[in-house]
């Protein structure tokens, strides 16, 4: 539906451009009929006075802003937990083993190690409000412990290390979601995979994300696309050791279509 709406906008804008082109082409054509009609054609062209030309330019600019814009004007922002060096060390070790098994992973590709709190697409020019909200919440939240306890293939056929959920992290995720959902883009299309999970689809329609509130499951994604048999084999043969770490900051990053980020564009420390 969203894609069709964008296409209709583009068609209307193109029609306006063609109309303007036709007007000026007719004026130019009338000047080239023959020398005997020069004065008449000049008169026809002069009918398009300066005011009309300016009006066309102004209307064209407005239409370009409205019809020429689309969903690319909006951004996916991931608001996430940043952990201490213990998390980095353990994820690095797992990623090294993945690489030894010829499995491409996110860490070796330069993606940021993080636990997503809330990921969605926002209205353009919302970043300032997102930063403001994150700063306020971080300044009221104490740093807390996290325990990663299992390595598992996700329902999206990727690989992740899962943390035990607790009151601290669930409350933080809920607070972030409630305070940021007002800035999200409302007409985003539901991802195909979400439609297979009715509860996730309901949450996506309400909050722009399927992984909030009762579906929040804290984890670090290790890879996003890989052969399932390779993942199964790795899990079977890898001796995963649970580890503890501490949530120390809340970060914001521009996310790709898979929710992954390569740069932290803003972060605010939690109360130590």
Residue spans for each PLM region:
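Short, Lys/Arg-enriched N-terminal segments with co-localized hydrophobic residues
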Residues: 1-6
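Sec-dependent N-terminal signal peptides
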Residues: 11-19
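C-terminal segment of classical bacterial N-terminal signal peptides
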Residues: 21-24
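Cleaved targeting-peptide boundary
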Residues: 26-34
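Juxtamembrane low-complexity tails/linkers enriched in Ser/Thr-Pro and polybasic
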Residues: 34-43
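Membrane-penetrating hydrophobic segments
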Residues: 42-52
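Basic, often amphipathic N-terminal segments
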Residues: 54-145, 151-153, 163-249, 262-272
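Interaction-mediating elements
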Residues: 250-258
